[in-house]
Amino acid sequence: MNYEEIFTFDNLLEAHYKSRKNKRHKKEVIIFEENLLVNIENLRRRLIKHQYRITSYNRFTIYEPKKRDVAALSYEDRIVQHCFCDNYLTPLLDKKLIYDNAACRKTKGTDFARDRVTSFLYSFYKKHGLNGYILRFDIHHYFDEIDHNILKGKIDKIVKDETLNAFCKMIIDSLIVVVVKVYL
């Protein structure tokens, strides 16, 4: 699939419908939908002419269930990324992921992950009884600290089309995170 086949009017419209899920009350969604077909066509034209650029992220902090800094895309950028991921990147990468990876994969949601963990725990218990440990942890600022050069090197091995490769890298580089480490 090439760049133009990904960013068709129909694909962008479908991405809009997915992007607005649970967000129909938001101001930018309402404004976008006032001239939906025109906005989709204008977005498609900018993409095809390679004039599309990701806008700045809306940064804010949430405190429930724990404090997290969030960088949210504009609505239009969410549509573009939904379209790109749903029609190209996800089908490409899905084949390369391990079976047990349930993160953001169709047909592999919370129930799938719970069932797999239950299966692994049962299997472990049959072999070892109660002699073992379960570690529950969170990698602090995991996505913020991913080295963009390493990630782009991996993209080079998977995304062979130059235009799609450049588009992928534009998305990767669109979020610049400054991580300050304090050593005491």
Language model features with spans:
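Conserved polymerase palm-domain catalytic core
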Residues: R46, F120, F124-L184
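Glycine-/proline-rich flexible loop or hinge segments
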Residues: K18-I30, F60-A71, I98-D100
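Non-catalytic, well-ordered alpha-helical scaffold segments
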Residues: D10-L13, L37, E41, D77-H82, ...
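Active-site-proximal segment of RNA-dependent polymerases
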Residues: N87-D147
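Short, compositionally biased low-complexity segments
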Residues: I6-N22, I54-R59, D86-L93, L175
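Conserved pre-motif C helix in the palm subdomain of viral-like polymerases
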Residues: K67-I98, V182-L184
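Non-catalytic, polymerase-adjacent accessory regions of viral genome-replication enzymes
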Residues: M1-E41
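Reverse-transcriptase-like RNA-dependent polymerase core
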Residues: L43-K66, I79, D86, A166-V178
